[in-house]
Amino acid sequence: MKIKQVHVRASKIKLKETFTIALGTIESADSAIVEIETEEGLVGYGEGGPGIFITGETLAGTLETIELFGQAIIGLNPFNIEKIHEVMDKISAFAPAAKAAIDIACYDLMGQKAQLPLYQLLGGYDNQVITDITLGIDEPNVMAQKAVEKVKLGFDTLKIKVGTGIEADIARVKAIREAVGFDIKLRLDANQAWTPKDAVKAIQALADYQIELVEQPVKRRDLEGLKYVTSQVNTTIMADESCFDAQDALELVKKGTVDVINIKLMKCGGIHEALKINQICETAGIECMIGCMAEETTIGITAAAHLAAAQKNITRADLDATFGLETAPVTGGVSLEAKPLLELGEAAGLGISH
């Protein structure tokens, strides 16, 4: 099996409502959709959702980089994923969303060629994933009302975006907990907004509110600060922006910096690198979450769900980006309907078509 053509197009899908985090506000899911065609006529689908707040990538830059990658991998076998990543790394030192788009399409082709759903090729641990759902930053009463609505849809785990000041953040969490009760798990994500001391103060102030975990409380490069927070609180601390690739994961693990690591395909460059991160973490006794960018659509979320289902050490999922989309850019894959259970089915590869 050899790659014959690589096509890329821009996809811009309006969100049902704006999504605000500590780093900024997102109004649409802007991503690059890739189709890799083989000489025998198979077509693999990939996606690069460039999260400018996280990776610094733009849609225009991602499209251009994918064009360069596409020209360079013509004639290669999608199964030779190590070689394909070597080719991409020589062209661009970073560009994780662009690399993820090519990577995901190659894995889709592998599944199609093997006539197996992708999760079977990646480990086959399960065929479904349970995801949380995220509440963007808003006034406490508004977030509490939305939390109740999400619980009515069947979600038992809510991820709460915080990061506009610890007093306001504490008020948000208290309002949500009072609205949904204590049977619902609450996760917090500060997106690097707190100082280490403020993080400890906020987490300790919320001790009675049973927070499951706190994600990326401090600046991504402040590993000492991250370790300080982890050492000072009983709540589970998770790295997100501090872990882009396997090298980052190794450093976090060696230093005992956090309790959990969040893997995102758009952060690490695709499934190939994500597997390395998970293997490092599993060896060290560190569980992983699989997360997503708000810019992702059906393809990226479906690929992440297959990886999460396949690997036992990926114990949590935050794969809710499709729930906010007005429409989907492709047919098949995970549903746009907001529901906690993502069922993957038995279609070969990702189960996606144009």
Curated annotation (Swiss-Prot):
Instruction: Tell me yes or no: is Cell division among this UniProt entry's keywords.
Output: no
Instruction: Recite the UniProt keywords alphabetically.
Output: Isomerase, Magnesium, Metal-binding
What does it do?
Answer: Catalyzes the epimerization of L-Ile-L-Tyr to L-Ile-D-Tyr (in vitro). Catalyzes the epimerization of dipeptides, with a preference for substrates with a hydrophobic or basic amino acid in the first position, followed by an aromatic residue in the second position. Has epimerase activity with L-Ile-L-Tyr, L-Val-L-Tyr and L-Arg-L-Tyr (in vitro).
Gene3D superfamilies on file: Enolase-like C-terminal domain, Enolase-like, N-terminal domain
Task: Tell me which cofactor or cofactors this protein depends on.
Answer: Mg(2+)
Output the Pfam families linked to this UniProt entry.
Answer: MR_MLE_C, MR_MLE_N
* PROSITE patterns noted in UniProt: MR_MLE_2
- In this chain, Mg(2+) is annotated as bound at D189, E215, D240
A GO molecular function annotation here is: racemase and epimerase activity, acting on amino acids and derivatives
Q: Which organism is it from?
A: Enterococcus faecalis (strain ATCC 700802 / V583)
Per its record, how is this protein called by name? Hydrophobic dipeptide epimerase
Instruction: Tell me the protein family, please.
Output: Belongs to the mandelate racemase/muconate lactonizing enzyme family.
- Give me the comment on cofactor binding: Binds 1 Mg(2+) ion per subunit.
- Binding-site list for substrate: T134, K159, I160, K161, N191, K264, C292, M293, A294, E295, D318, L319, D320
Determine if Magnesium is one of this entry's keywords. yes
Q: EC number(s) in its UniProt entry?
A: 5.1.1.-
Q: Which SMART domains match?
A: MR_MLE (SM00922)
**Misc remark:** Part of a large, functionally divergent protein family. Protein modeling and substrate docking was used to predict the substrate specificity, prior to biochemical analysis.
Q: Tell me, what is an example of a GO biological process annotation in this record?
A: peptide metabolic process
